[in-house]
Amino acid sequence: MSIERTLSIIKPDAVAKNVVGQIVARFEQAGLKVIAARMQQLSRTDAERFYAVHKERPFFKDLVDFMVSGPVFVQVLEGESAIQKNRDLMGATDPKKAAPGTIRADFADSIDANAVHGSDAPETAAVEVAFFFPEINIHSR
């Protein structure tokens, strides 16, 4: 096992429901540490840049529109196997297919408004963390 860092975004739907604290508590209860965090309103340009990998997909415009529809809570999580642990806690992308007790099963409304984003691999985690948090703003604890 190795200590990893991963990016977690609590999306506009979950922020609007006022469940940020409940979601962060789940990460902490699973042994993940929040080592950087902030609430922010994404600009359209930032959302398009962050999700550029999906630019040619039919859902790209709707995804960007959703991500700029309200503030997001962006955080870096650190811990043993943080990437997989975060993905397990989030559950399936489609909340209808998410296991009971996962974040998406409990807080998401649809495959589009699915409460959270998490990095899917070490390489993407490094890129995604750097997108939101220059190294100077990350503090292991």
From Swiss-Prot:
Its cofactor is Mg(2+). Its EC number is 2.7.4.6. NCBIfam families: PRK00668.1 (NF001908). ATP binds at K11, F59, R87, T93, R104, N114. The active site is at H117 (pros-phosphohistidine intermediate). Belongs to the NDK family. One of its GO terms (cellular component) is cytoplasm. Keywords: ATP-binding, Cytoplasm, Kinase, Magnesium, Metal-binding, Nucleotide metabolism, Nucleotide-binding, Phosphoprotein, Transferase. One of its GO terms (molecular function) is nucleoside diphosphate kinase activity. It catalyses: a 2'-deoxyribonucleoside 5'-diphosphate + ATP = a 2'-deoxyribonucleoside 5'-triphosphate + ADP; a ribonucleoside 5'-diphosphate + ATP = a ribonucleoside 5'-triphosphate + ADP. Homotetramer. Its main location: cytoplasm. It is found in: Cytoplasm. This is Nucleoside diphosphate kinase. Major role in the synthesis of nucleoside triphosphates other than ATP. The ATP gamma phosphate is transferred to the NDP beta phosphate via a ping-pong mechanism, using a phosphorylated active-site intermediate. GO terms for biological process: CTP biosynthetic process; GTP biosynthetic process; UTP biosynthetic process. SUPFAM superfamilies: Nucleoside diphosphate kinase, NDK.
